[in-house]
Each structure stands twice: as C-alpha cells, then as structure tokens.
Amino acid sequence: MTRPGSDIRVILFDLDNTLYPPDAGLIEAGDRLIADFIARRLDLPWDEADRLRVRLWLQYGATARGLEVEYGIPQREYFTGSLERVDVSRYISPDPDLAELLGSLPQRRFVFTNSSELYAERVLEALGVRGLFEGVFHIESSGGRPKPDSHPYDVAVQATGEQPQHMALIDDTEANLGPAAEMGMLTIKLGEAPDDPRHLHLIDLHDLPGLL
C-alpha cells in the first residue's frame, strides 16, 4: 500500500509547539511578554491587553498583524518589544532525538512560521537543529502577512521551486493547514485530531516517517 506522503519532496515545519513540545513553557513566556507589550503600548490593564492579544491572534493569524492593522503598530516594534525579549534557552535545549529525526528524512526541510526571523533562528539554535533546515520562512519573508493568509504559502512554493503536490505542511494549528490543502499540499495536523478530513493526524512528531 502506498503511503500518503510517498511522493513528498519538501516538508514545511511549523515552529512553535511543533518542533518542541507544548509543555516547554516557551509559548506561555512569549504570550506574557506580548501582553506586557500591548499593555504598555496601548496603556491598557494587563488582563485587557491579554484578551486583546488572543482576539487579534484568532482574527488575523498573528497578534503582530492585528496590532499593525488596527492600531498602526509596526510589526518590527512588536517583535522587538515582545517575543525577541524571550530567553529561549530557559525553556528549550538541544534535542538529539529531534535532530536524529530530521536528519533521517530524505526530503528538503524548511521552517514555516509566523514569528520573526530572529526569534525563529534563536529557537532553532537552542534546539540544536538549525543546520538541518535548508531555510526559514518567517513573517519578514512574507511581507508581514501571516498564516493563514495565502501569501506566505505562495512565497514558500515559489522559493522552494517545488509543486504543491510534492510538498507537506506540519502544523499544530488547524487553521493554518487549510490554505496548504487548497493548494494541493499534504497537510498534517500535529497534536489534537483535526476536524477537517483532508488533514492527516500525527500525535507525535517522531512518528512522521511512517507517513512519508
């Protein structure tokens, strides 16, 4: 029987909560700093700032984009004042098992994230896997337009030079998989089971070779 991903040549990996486990604490640390930034920048009570953070993330795919659209706050100011202040080494460390998994995959590998280039590079270096990826697609490379906007996916397809039918996307956020599936990519939901039957389900990233 042919495996669903047997003709995949390029794999796009989401970054946060995909290349490291959700219980690492890094996401929570970043969320606190984002709420801190919003509270300072908009002169809001912290709880209100945190609720705004969540609403903008749900509505725009990235809080940075929402703050830019609704409040005119440059994304560079947002990242400098929030996520790029996180000491990622407090939450994640070199992961030999992840490195072994990535190194065993014959496909070309890229990171596909809504975070900034600097933050993504720091996370990959902390995990000890930067050299195992051909490149990183980040918020700057998509012109500030985050997943699930269609533009980042178009950028990734053009930059890799591969047909979507030969590409796979792995993401823990189901909303980010829809545009990839529409393009013809193999889409893999990590963590909780997907609602959309187009997406494959993967509980543990280390089981990925069984799908490919």
Question: Residue locations for each model-derived region?
Answer:
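Asp-based, Mg2+/Mn2+-dependent phosphohydrolase catalytic module
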Residues: 1-9, 99, 103, 110, ...
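N-terminal helical cap/lid subdomain that shapes the substrate entry/recognition surface
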Residues: 3-13, 18-96, 118
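A generic structural signal for short
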Residues: 23, 52-53, 90, 108-109, ...
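Generic structural signal for secondary-structure transition and capping sites
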Residues: 61, 107-110
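Residue-level marker of regulatory loop/turn positions in helix-turn-helix DNA-binding domains and
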Residues: 90, 94, 112, 145
